[in-house]
UniProtKB/Swiss-Prot annotation:
Name of this protein: TIR domain-containing adapter molecule 1
Gene responsible for this protein: TICAM1
Organism encoding this protein: Homo sapiens (Human)
Keywords: Antiviral defense, Apoptosis, Cytoplasm, Cytoplasmic vesicle, Disease variant, Host-virus interaction, Immunity, Inflammatory response, Innate immunity, Isopeptide bond, Mitochondrion, Phosphoprotein, Ubl conjugation
SUPFAM superfamilies for this protein: Toll/Interleukin receptor TIR domain
Region (Disordered): 216-316, 336-384, 620-677
Lineage per the UniProt record: Eukaryota, Metazoa, Chordata, Craniata, Vertebrata
Pfam families referenced in this protein's UniProt entry, alphabetically: RHIM (PF12721), TRIF-NTD (PF17798)
Resulting phenotype, E493A: Loss of TCAM1-induced NF-kappa-B and IRF3 activation
Tissues with expression: Ubiquitously expressed but with higher levels in liver.
Any single Gene Ontology cellular-component annotation: endosome
Length: 712
């Protein structure tokens, strides 16, 4: 009589009911070893015993003589267990569970029997305190689900006791909490399902949230609902006010006692990785006396939002400004970040470069609006091609179809995924983006999938479908490392007679995947093998990385060309600048040799005929990597204006020509010399020279001729 529960005899009964053909198929399939498939050799020996091939079965069992379960199978088959009465090995329940897993994969037994077998194995190892229990539980979770490895007897529903909570005990050394601490669970009832009676005394309606005053809250991002009520400036009054009901989740945070400022609790040697530290000087003053909480109370992250326009729920501590808000040590054993806004009393500053030796290096801060995390990264200087390529998902297969066959494509994708081929896609659902070119969508579908499935129906005969076939075939021929990636698929809704002659001729050299076939599921398993899918995904990642690096290289080449052009422009500017300096030097020498007015202007600013030169500094020479810098100027060249250049610069205003105190008395003309001649004025009292209309008035003694004329 067949056994009802999972056991070795019941496994033999299942094999006996499978039939001769199925046993022959299992014999050849199990003969090839598969990595990570425990129990395959034992099942192969049992199949040989059921087929009557005792010689081969004896050889297989002899190879497994180190396995106690295999020796038990040999003794049971030989019929010697009744005389010797051997002790059952401890691993027999685990081996039976693995056998039932293989039988369930071959559809020879329901999955429920496999689950029962694993439950029995877990129960057996738990009763013996076997050290391999964790390994068995992991295997059971992977094969049967997460609920199979637990103990059903230990699961209880939650229960809420609406009675009075145990009174709080004030601990002198512990932290204080508002509004009421939770000391212990000794007097509590067992858990049951959550329920609410709606009474005013319900626990859920009286919960309040208190703010931890041990640190100024530095948020990485502001709350979308508005500023927090817990993070405003401290009010003049510290009297608690009623809480607006229904605006915050129940959460408890600790307040330190007033005497804890001088003696903070001991800090841990190393904070948890990735959590901010809080400085020990962030303390609170003027706190009201509240019941003390147990030492195990911990500050947890709470994102506070404004629920109503009511008054503040709790008194706020006075926060003193700290030296570095970005690196502050908390006074509680666990440092946890709280999302909130920074107090106005704190001043933002750059992060400190040093950290304690006992703490691990903190992770790089995420980009935010706070000054402490505003750092420039090298990736901001280049296009994020690698990041954009990683956003594109890789599919194990994509179904190309006609527009009228969208429902068939969705059904085929769901069926293939049900047969064990995950991450499938259809052309209409995953790649046809509205507004994008049809050919670009087709190319994306081909580039980001391991296998291309052509849905052969009577509608698959238009020009667009033929183009899809041609593109898929060319991709099959040209893509390296991806042979045999095009699969013609004949669904249940179609037949070979309904296909067009063009499509049939193009795909005549490829083997079809026919859904009408009786071994369709087996063909799917042989086609979409996991190692083939993993290899093609690895090849796809290499292609995406290569493409991203190529785009970055092109971007860098463009920037390099721009830098070379700018360098050439600056070199031309430098040449013109040096030429201008040489010309100005010649002009200054020529003008200086012919100056005759004893004005107080500098030598470099004096010109004949009342002319003037601006005395401003030359424009700053722009810097660029690899561009030569201009030579230093002499003191007399400080007022020279630059020549026209590729980039014009603003020049300072010219200074007025200095005024002479008195015009010199006219004298006989000196001997003329070739070149520029000085200006000589006779018989004039008022003289106006230059562009600034300065007047010189000479009222000294008159010439003898003038005196003679006046006497007459």
């Amino acid at each position: 009589m067949a056994c009802t529960g999972p056991s070795l005899p019941s496994a033999f009964d299942i094999l006996g009911a499978a039939g001769q053909d199925k046993l022959l198929y299992l014999k050849h399939k199990l003969k090839t070893p598969r990595p990570g498939c425990q129990g395959q050799d034992l099942l192969h020996a049992m199949v040989l015993l059921k087929l009557g091939q005792e010689t081969e079965a004896r050889i297989s069992l002899e190879a497994l003589k180190a396995d106690a379960v295999a020796r038990l199978v040999a003794r049971q088959w030989a019929g010697v267990d009744s005389t010797e009465d051997p002790e059952e090995p401890p691993d027999v329940s685990w081996a039976v569970a693995r056998l039932y897993h293989l039988l369930a994969e071959e559809k020879l037994c329901p999955a429920s029997l496999r689950d029962v077998a694993y439950q029995e194995a877990v129960r057996t190892l738990s009763s013996r305190d076997d050290h391999r229990l964790g390994e068995l539980q992991d295997e059971a979770r992977n094969r049967c689900g997460w609920d199979i490895a637990g103990d059903p007897g230990s699961i209880r529903t939650l229960q809420s006791n609406l009675g009075c909570l145990p009174p709080s005990s004030a601990l002198p050394s512990g932290t204080r909490s508002l509004p009421r601490p939770i000391d212990g669970v000794s007097d509590w009832s067992q858990g049951c399902s959550l329920r609410s009676t709606g009474s005013p005394a319900s626990l859920a309606s009286n919960l309040e949230i208190s703010q931890s005053p041990t640190m100024p809250f530095l948020s990485l991002h502001r709350s979308p609902h508005g500023p927090s009520k817990l993070c405003d400036d401290p009010q003049a009054s510290l009297v608690p006010e009623p809480v607006p009901g229904g605006c915050q989740e129940p959460e408890e945070m600790s307040w330190p006692p007033s005497g804890e400022i001088a003696s903070p609790p001991e800090l841990p040697s190393s904070p948890p990785p990735g959590l901010p530290e809080v400085a020990p000087d962030a303390t609170s003053t003027g706190l009201p006396d509240t019941p003390a909480a147990p030492e195990t109370s911990t500050n947890y992250p709470v994102e506070c939002t404004e629920g109503s326009a009511g008054p503040q729920s709790l008194p706020l501590p006075i926060l003193e400004p700290v030296k570095n808000p970005c690196s502050v040590k908390d006074q509680t054993p666990l440092q946890l970040s709280v999302e909130d806004t920074t107090s106005p009393n704190t001043k933002p500053c750059p992060p400190t470069p040093t950290t304690p030796e006992t703490s691990p290096p903190p992770p790089p801060p995420p980009p935010s609006s706070t000054p402490c995390s505003a750092h420039l990264t090298p990736s901001s200087l280049f296009p994020s091609s690698l990041e954009s390529s990683s956003e594109q998902k890789f599919y194990n297969f994509v179904i190309l179809h006609a527009r009228a066959d969208e429902h068939i494509a969705l059904r085929v994708r769901e069926k293939l995924e049900a047969l064990g081929v995950p991450d499938g896609a259809t052309f209409c659902e995953d790649f046809q983006v509205p507004g994008r070119g049809e050919l670009s969508c087709l190319q994306d579908a081909i580039d980001h999938s391991a296998f291309i499935i052509l849905l052969l129906t009577s509608n698959f005969d238009c020009r667009l479908s033929l183009h899809q076939v041609n593109q898929a075939m060319m991709s099959n021929l040209t893509r390296q490392g991806s042979p045999d990636c095009v699969i013609p698929f004949l669904p249940l809704e179609s037949s070979p007679a309904q296909l067009s002659s063009d499509t049939a001729s193009l795909l005549s050299g490829l083997v079809r995947l026919d859904e009408h076939s009786q071994i369709f599921a087996r063909k799917v398993a042989n086609t979409f093998k996991p190692h083939r899918l993993q290899a093609r995904k690895a090849m796809w990642r290499k292609e995406q990385d290569t493409r991203a690096l190529r785009e970055q290289s092109q971007h860098l080449d463009g920037e390099r060309m721009q830098a070379a052009a700018l360098n050439a422009a600056y070199s031309a500017y430098l040449q013109s600048y040096l030429s201008y300096q040489a010309q100005m030097e010649q002009l200054q020498v020529a003008f200086g040799s012919h100056m005759s007015f004893g004005t107080g202007a500098p030598y470099g600013a004096r010109m004949p005929f009342g002319g003037q030169v601006p005395l401003g500094a030359p424009p700053p020479f722009p810097t660029w990597p690899g561009c030569p810098q201009p030579p230093p100027l002499h003191a007399w060249q400080a007022g020279t204006p630059p020549p026209p250049s590729p980039q014009p610069a603003a020049f300072p205003q010219s200074l007025p020509f200095p005024q002479s105190p008195a015009f010199p008395t006219a004298s006989p003309a000196p001997p003329q010399s070739p070149g520029l001649q000085p200006l000589i004025i006779h018989h004039a009292q008022m003289v106006q020279l230059g562009l600034n209309n300065h007047m010189w008035n000479q009222r000294g003694s008159q010439a003898p001729e003038d005196k003679t004329q006046e006497a007459e």
